């Protein structure tokens, strides 16, 4: 009793995700991370690799990051930005490969609308750039990709 058995500390510098070191630079350049996301050039990871995501319920999405926006525990379903894109194509059922088949869903407006949004100047508003795309596939800030870079030992 009374002895310290666990201590949570910062990791050694060599284990810190290198992309996180760019965050302060981006904030200085853009004023905030949200401003960066508004301006981010998107290089879609899954489009490059020709990947796609099918949910357990049979809904076709561009990637797991977009699919993960559907049901955030802190938001009521339908509040997240992705729902505007879904509602614009007639609802979630329009993305069901079980009802419509893979080809029809893939060639529908949902995927094209997301890709077209990347040219928008802001992530805000009903027809803004899909923010999750800026967060995960913005070219100046990629903590996901950086985690796979080799650590110098």
What is each residue range found by the language model?
Residues 119-153:
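Cysteine-cluster motifs in flexible loop/terminal segments that predominantly coordinate metals
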Residues 106-125:
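C-terminal structured domain segments
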Residues 1-104, 113-115, 142-151:
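Radical SAM enzyme [4Fe-4S]-AdoMet core and its adjacent flexible, acidic
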């Amino acid at each position: 009793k009374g002895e310290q058995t666990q201590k949570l500390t910062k990791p050694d510098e060599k284990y810190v995700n290198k992309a996180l070191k760019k965050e302060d630079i981006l904030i200085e350049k853009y004023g905030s991370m949200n401003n960066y996301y508004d301006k981010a050039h998107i290089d879609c990871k899954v489009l490059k690799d020709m990947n796609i995501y099918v949910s357990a319920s049979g809904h076709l999405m561009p990637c797991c990051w977009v699919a993960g926006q559907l049901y955030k525990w802190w938001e009521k379903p339908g509040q997240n930005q992705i729902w505007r894109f879904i509602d614009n194509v007639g609802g979630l059922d329009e993305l069901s490969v079980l009802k419509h088949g893979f080809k029809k869903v893939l060639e529908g407006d949902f995927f094209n609308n997301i890709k077209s949004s990347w040219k928008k100047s802001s992530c805000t508003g009903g027809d803004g750039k899909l923010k999750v795309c800026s967060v995960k596939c913005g070219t100046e800030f990629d903590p996901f990709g950086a985690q796979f870079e080799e650590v110098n030992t």
